[in-house]
């Protein structure tokens, strides 16, 4: 015997959709932030990300353009450095996102968020390294300034990372300083 199918398929039960939380609005500039303001702190972290991205590019270009008797050592060191700067940028960016703030959408936005770095103006190896050395020292100082701010807003993960990043920056600067003294 034939049993006809229903004329209309039963409608599936609607599954309730949970609301997706919206990310925080763009943080205020540090000069407009109140003491202990998370948005101002995040803006400074984004500025540090911009600085790290500039350092990555600088280390990579020096890596490509460096010439000298110690080429092999410097070439390898700078490769490690630009790879480290990419990892540092990514880690700090992930910390920012974990606090539900957005990163800039493009290179221009990222560059606008940062103070910029000292630029290399010579192809002479020692001069390129001297500029990079100064920028690494500045990176270390920036992390020292951000570490207590991270503690103030309760971002202990970022606080710990600032201490780690500070050590990495000053160690790399020491390597370059020792190279410049002997070469």
Segments the model singles out, each with a brief description of its role:
Residues 3-33:
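Acidic, proline-/serine-/threonine-rich low-complexity intrinsically disordered repeat tracts
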Residues 32-47:
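Short, charged, low-complexity amphipathic alpha-helix
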Residues 44, 48, 55, 74-77, ...:
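General structural feature for long, well-ordered alpha-helical segments within catalytic domains
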Residues 44-45, 111-164:
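Acidic/histidine-rich alpha-helical segments that form the ligand environment
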Residues 49, 56-59, 63, 89, ...:
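A structural signal for well-ordered alpha-helices, especially hydrophobic packing surfaces
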Residues 54-80, 142, 146-157:
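Helix-loop segments that flank and shape redox-cofactor active sites
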Residues 72-109:
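Conserved alpha-helical segments that form or flank metal/cofactor-binding pockets of metalloenzymes
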